């Protein structure tokens, strides 16, 4: 089944059989990408073996899209044994939402959507005010509510250790207490390929199968597997405002401050989140090969353009302690 060409904002390619490379092997020696793939598939199967009701956290970004491909391979020819869970802030890129819906249909996976707006309406979250309001932190109650409502005991995520210092010290199997919180000083040892998924009632785990991957690994894997992505990852013309060194794309949720003005240039996203906190980079890379070259020469980190990470030195760790992804 091919993605419809009637939808804009999509990089159209069919999600072919995930095992298409098996016939291409002429050697038992694995490449570094195949080693990373094998490690991730092993962890996904370990999750299926140890937990009763897992889920895959799906943002619509490149890492979670790669996670879907890995899950297909881990359990082929069966369907994915867990649903995709997306937390919709209401401030997402439209291209991401369209791609999310089509991919879920393409791989025949159940899609569960947690709503930040519903949490605000119910009084469980409060909208930020001020010059730089964001709903990024408000994803926490929406996510924890979805986990509690559906009684998930393990949530697979696409976080990687090279992204940010808080994620660099997190385990593959990351324990969460009954409040959904993470204690970085109380993490379990992980020796070789042994993972301890024991927990008490009401607790759960966050599992990160691609922890050892880098941004370059992800893009090389996307090329190797011919994986389709939302068009915002590729160079396109868009209006934006420069704020504190971050290029924020024009949207109804961003109000210009004194002295600011909209600019227009060719840009793309290196990482995808809310429009209010996802910084773009000026780029002419409009295909995967060009992006791989760009990443190899980059002197700024992948999340260096994320406004939510610039709120403090420990911004990510503080959010994770409260139950963030």
What is the role of each PLM region?
Residues 16-325:
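Nucleotide-activated chemistry modules centered on ATP-dependent adenylation/adenylyltransferase
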């Amino acid at each position: 089944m091919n993605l419809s060409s009637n939808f804009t904002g999509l990089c159209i390619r069919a999600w072919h059989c995930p095992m298409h490379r098996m016939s291409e092997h002429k050697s038992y020696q694995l490449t570094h990408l195949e080693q990373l793939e094998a490690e991730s598939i092993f962890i996904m199967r370990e999750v299926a073996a140890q937990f009763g009701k897992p889920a895959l956290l799906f943002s619509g970004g490149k890492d979670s899209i790669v996670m879907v491909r890995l899950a297909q391979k881990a359990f082929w020819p069966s369907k994915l044994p867990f649903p995709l869970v997306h937390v919709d802030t209401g401030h997402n890129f439209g291209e991401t939402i369209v791609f999310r819906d089509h991919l879920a249909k393409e791989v025949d996976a159940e899609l569960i959507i947690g709503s930040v707006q519903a949490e605000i309406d119910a009084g469980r979250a409060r909208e930020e005010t001020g010059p730089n309001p964001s709903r990024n932190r408000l994803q926490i109650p929406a996510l924890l509510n979805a986990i509690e409502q559906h009684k998930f005991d393990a949530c697979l995520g696409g976080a990687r250790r090279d992204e940010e210092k808080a994620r660099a010290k997190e385990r593959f199997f990351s324990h969460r207490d009954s409040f959904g919180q993470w204690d970085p000083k109380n993490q379990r040892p992980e020796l070789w390929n042994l993972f301890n998924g024991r927990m008490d009632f009401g607790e759960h785990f966050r599992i990160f199968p691609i922890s050892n991957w880098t941004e370059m690994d992800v893009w090389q894997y996307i090329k190797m597997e011919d994986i389709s992505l939302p068009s915002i990852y590729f160079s396109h013309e868009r209006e934006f405002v420069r704020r504190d060194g971050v290029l924020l794309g024009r949207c109804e949720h961003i109000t210009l401050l004194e002295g600011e003005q909209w600019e227009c240039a060719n840009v793309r996203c290196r990482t995808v989140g809310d429009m209010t906190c996802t910084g773009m980079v000026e780029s002419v890379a409009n295909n995967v090969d060009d992006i791989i070259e760009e990443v190899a020469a980059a002197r700024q980190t992948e999340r260096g353009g994320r406004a939510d990470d610039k709120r403090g030195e420990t911004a990510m760790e503080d959010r994770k302690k409260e139950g963030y992804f």
